[in-house]
């Protein structure tokens, strides 16, 4: 099958494969983002050894090390190891891998791929010292070895490989963080799969599933977008109905605390400070809380940001599109309503949600917005701002503020609308008030440029003149 997007990653991996020295590559990113698919489709029949760690989800932890060693032994046998018994330790297991690779060594590049490496590091298994010894003591001494490891547990990958302070310090020759598809890559994917969909619908698909290839791969091209959403999320035996629990259960130990934080952040689009999160979730302050926030950030479920005008008040907001959708529509439903999306497609509830979700899509495509504004080469800082009164009541909301190094500031109004967006007299007054509030907060040398980001553009009338730039959903592709 064709690999959609990933051009930079493909070029880097091919360059590393063709080098004449040992290479140690770590690929990490959110679960379901396509790490394994990329390696499998790129290298196809060039693997010397391939092993996938055993998922700990729904397994008894006391047997995990035994089971991990057993499956590793089976992989060794699949690739030709004979005359050996199942190893009882990871030192012994990697010694058997060395033996297998020596048998296969013909002087050509030998590609070793270990998928879901973090799952193999079970409690008290001493996996890391054995893995360090395999690389430092043997693999790194062979110029024809290329070792690729993958993992969805991003913090494990960063702590134990990328930022390792022990035996693997500075041993990686390359690290690749694989991100979800952009809208443009989703469009390429749908076209490749012969799925006919307008960009208007593609944006709504992105609101629901994000750019996660695995979810998009489940689409049935015979169905409309509402039918696909129902089939995957709301109908009986929907394939993704339990995905939220499975996702966190496979990524994190003690996943309940991680899910508490995510559920907390789903309640307010602007997010919360660390202190507010701990108070709402009852998670104790300390290293554990920091680890949770760091892990969720590294896995791209949440993002830290500084709200406009609050340079020392870091907030965290939920940014994973699938989680946002799931927690809004499915989390509290004892039994999801069959055909919910089709039955409510034009309802006020769904239209209101689309407005919020479109803002998140725009925040996921800042580089595309900057390119459309012609400011890709200018340093910028992006934020949002909810203006509140003395009692904390919201007075005004600014969806996206782009502060530029050239002393211009784009105040972006984001609207998801079924036709051309029209500014009437009342909304014109609202926009002027927002601009004045922002101007009062900025330096006198800064210029505010009102910018709209809408689905199909701005209707020209007597009130549209103050808009300096008008972008549409096409600019996000």
Tell where the protein language model's regions lie, with residue ranges.
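Phosphate-binding site recognition
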Residues: 1-348, 450
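A cross-kingdom feature that marks ATP-driven nucleic-acid transaction machinery
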Residues: 308, 314-477
């Amino acid at each position: 099958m064709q690999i959609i997007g990933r051009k930079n990653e493909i070029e880097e991996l091919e360059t590393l494969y063709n080098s004449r020295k040992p290479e140690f590559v770590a690929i990490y990113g959110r679960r379901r983002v396509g790490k394994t698919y990329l390696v499998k489709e790129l290298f196809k029949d060039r693997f010397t050894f391939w092993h996938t760690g055993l998922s700990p989800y729904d397994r008894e932890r006391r047997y995990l090390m035994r089971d991990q060693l057993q499956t590793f032994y089976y992989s060794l046998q699949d690739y030709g190891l004979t005359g050996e018994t199942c190893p009882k330790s990871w030192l012994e297991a990697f010694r058997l891998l060395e033996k297998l690779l020596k048998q296969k060594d013909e002087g050509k590049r030998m590609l070793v791929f270990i998928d879901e490496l973090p799952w193999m590091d079970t409690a008290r298994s001493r996996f890391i010292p054995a893995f360090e010894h395999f690389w430092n003591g043997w693999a790194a001494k062979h110029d024809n070895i290329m070792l690729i490891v993958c993992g969805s547990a991003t913090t494990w990958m960063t702590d134990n490989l990328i930022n390792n302070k022990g035996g693997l310090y500075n041993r990686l020759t390359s690290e690749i963080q694989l991100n979800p598809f952009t809208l443009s890559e989703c469009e390429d994917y749908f076209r490749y799969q012969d799925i006919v969909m307008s960009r208007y619908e593609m944006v709504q698909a992105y609101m629901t599933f994000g750019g996660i290839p695995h979810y998009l791969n489940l689409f049935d091209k015979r169905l409309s977008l509402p039918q696909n959403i129902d089939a995957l999320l709301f109908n009986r035996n929907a394939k993704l109905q339990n995905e939220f629990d499975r996702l966190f259960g496979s990524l994190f130990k003690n996943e309940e605390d991680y899910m508490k934080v995510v559920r907390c952040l789903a309640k307010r689009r602007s997010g919360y400070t660390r202190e507010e999160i701990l108070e709402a979730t009852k998670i104790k302050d300390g290293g554990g809380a920091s680890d949770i926030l760091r892990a969720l950030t590294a896995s791209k479920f949440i993002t830290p940001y500084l709200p406009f005008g609050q340079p020392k008040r870091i907030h965290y907001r939920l940014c994973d599109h699938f989680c946002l959708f799931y927690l809004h529509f499915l989390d509290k439903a004892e039994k999801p309503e069959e055909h919910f999306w089709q039955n409510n497609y034009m309802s006020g509830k769904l239209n209101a949600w689309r407005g919020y979700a479109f803002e998140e899509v725009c925040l996921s495509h800042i580089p595309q917005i900057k390119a459309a504004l012609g400011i890709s080469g200018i340093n910028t800082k992006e934020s949002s701002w909810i203006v509140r009164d003395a009692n904390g009541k919201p007075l005004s909301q600014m969806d996206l503020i782009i502060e530029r190094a050239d002393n211009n500031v784009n105040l972006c109004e984001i609207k998801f609308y079924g036709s051309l967006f029209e500014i009437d007299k009342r909304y014109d007054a609202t926009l002027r008030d927002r601009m004045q509030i922002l101007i009062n907060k900025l330096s006198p040398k800064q210029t505010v440029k009102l910018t709209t980001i809408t689905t199909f553009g701005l209707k020209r009338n007597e009130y549209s003149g103050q808009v300096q730039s008008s972008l549409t959903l096409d600019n996000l592709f």
